[in-house]
Amino acid sequence: MKKTLFIVIVLLFSAQSYSQKANFKAAEKFRSSNLNQKVGDLNVRANWIHETNKFWYSYKKSDGKNYYYVDADARSKKLLFDSRYMASQIHKLIHRPYNQLDLPIRDIEFEDESTTKFTFKIDSIRFLYNMTDRNLVIKDTVPEEERSGRWATYSPDSTWIAYAKNYNLFIMKANDPDSVEIQLSTDGELHYGYASSRSDTARDKKVRSIARWFENEEKLYVIKSDSREVSDLFVINALADPRPELETYKYSMPGEENVPQHELIIYDVESRERTDVDVAKWKDQRLRVRWTSQESADKMIIERKKRDLTELEICMVDANDGELRVLFNEKQYPYIYDGYGYGNLSVLNEGDDIIWWSERTGWGHLYLYDGNGKLKRQITDGYFVTGNIMRIDTSGRELYVQAFGREEGVHPYYTMLYRVSLDKGGMKLISPEDANHSFSMSETNDYWVDNYSRVDMPNKSVLRDANGSRLLDLEEPDLSMVYETGWQMPESFVVKAKDGVTDLFGVMFKPFDFDSTRKYPVISYVYPGPQTESVPYSFSVSHRYNTALAQLGFIVVNFGHRGGSPQRNNYYHTYGYNNLRDYALADDKYGIEQLADRYDFIDVEKVGIYGHSGGGFMSTAALLTYPEFYDVAVSSAGNHDNNIYNQWWGETHHGVKEIQKKVKVKKEEEEEVEKAYPAEENDSLKTEISFKSDVPANQDLAENLKGYLLLVHGDIDNNVHPGNSIRVVDALIKANKRFDFMIMPGQRHGFGRYTQYFETMMWYYFAEHLLGDYRTNVELKDY
């Protein structure tokens, strides 16, 4: 009898130790949508007034939204207007009531540099306000065409507009009721036209074109893309009314033969003449315009890049006759990176000086070339990464640039601002605080607004001068209502990568009723990059799903992995090349193990992982690669098979192999071949070039599934096609595995109005499989 009683007690204790109640009410309380209602603005968005040292901004706190006017020279800040007075004046004029705490004002524009008058819009009405005498009048009504969308691309002084119609390019005089449209092109057709890609199938109506104006508006240029041979991709909108609708679009994939082809065309506005620039160099090359001359319409600088991304050329084009000459080239292995704000090319003095960003030393830095493509000097140098050029002071020949990892002891992902001489170098730090900074500079380069914060330090918004001196405190957020809820800041941590040397930086989210004597399952929120690491470095009260998810009774961690970001160095950034599926997995597992060794409250026997897009791909790969370690994965919109994701992504980050093959040409074909390939000393053997890419996919690992997997995808996702998830589903079914699959009807890559539903289902999934808290309620919010 005693033995039986002992067994029953042990079994009951074991069941209780495994099954814990998830705190759904706390998760609901701290859901992003609920928290964000309790906090106003975090940053000051400075709107500089023409080329002055004055700006205005709006800022919302618990007492409402106010608008401010700042004179940087005078170090002064005042209300742009009194919101209560403004609401009453608007009511008098149009007889409509508005909430004085949150006026729906938009498009504030000062008339000129010296005036104190500005216009703004509410609904379809434009008002004019005089700050001096507080006089408000109705100026005009915004035309319906302006309100409903802009199909016109205006020339710099708004004299001309360009647009597309019937796949072709048109121009006409702006603001002239008698203006006659002028057709510049006649060769446009479907998927080879002059309209922006989303408008390419439109025919009789005017739509936005891909044409761009030279600064003096004498010419336009177009990079025309030929996608006629690119294969179609399809999604079906099952919710379309009255019947499901097929959506067809062009979509090139890694290694495919038929990819978009690009050409450069220049149009002269006065003569209507067309110049086709001979840009051909490499098969399937990429092309973009990097600069056009400002004072004339004579010159432009373009970039052409090999399909395998290992080489590019910067070229000067004579816009009058189309003559092209190479200024300099760049080679980089495994590939040249120039995405997400890096890859700067800036031009000074009408092409006499060219600033170029390169990772040729293993670290991203700036280089100065002359107008003939000769390297003059390296501008920035050291074991850190230079990022965006924020501003160029042409008269003082100084740059204001972002940089990462230059300051000893400062988080290497924090954006810091520096001033550097074009001719002498010598970087000066002008954002001294140990925090993540964002910037807005005046057109005069005399002042800038600095918003800085950390995940564990709320935002501060200040006005600085060009030396970084702090002149005026502008704003700090009102977090009183947030703190009243019991909200707490997350914690930063550092772990090592699997190599035992590389530092990985992350953030930990705990339940707000945290008990250090308890054991908590751990969930890793992941995004592998390689273009960015989805780890927060600035302050937020919600951090998307992580804050709420932790309240269920989890430790949620979010940290980077080798291969995740270009902000460290080229080796770190390209670590995953040729290994796109697996490169981040070992670091994630090893990082969690280190945290479990460091903190007794982390239960490494109960591990979850989740992510969206690349994170959806990575979370499934982790569960299938380390089935003995990860127990549960929620994977949304994952690009599980990068062979059917977009061409740029797979070929850039995993690689594409260029294959050259000598083929014998039949005599009757020689004339045609000569047009396509250069002659090789009259040899009948010609070179054919093809490309091959093969990325390991998640469905190849389906046999390994041991844990719990929830796959989620929008059924009209035209970024990451739902076929990515369905291929994994197919492989899991064939492997006789039990799993869960959810379709979000009518949703694309983001889940739109179903986002909150998805988040709640994720709560249930982790609560059931990590806490053992199984619920039978049908109503999701019957917690």
Where in this protein do the model-derived segments appear?
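Serine-hydrolase catalytic core recognition
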Residues: 46, 290, 297, 303, ...
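Beta-propeller folds
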Residues: 19-459, 463-464, 669-676, 771, ...
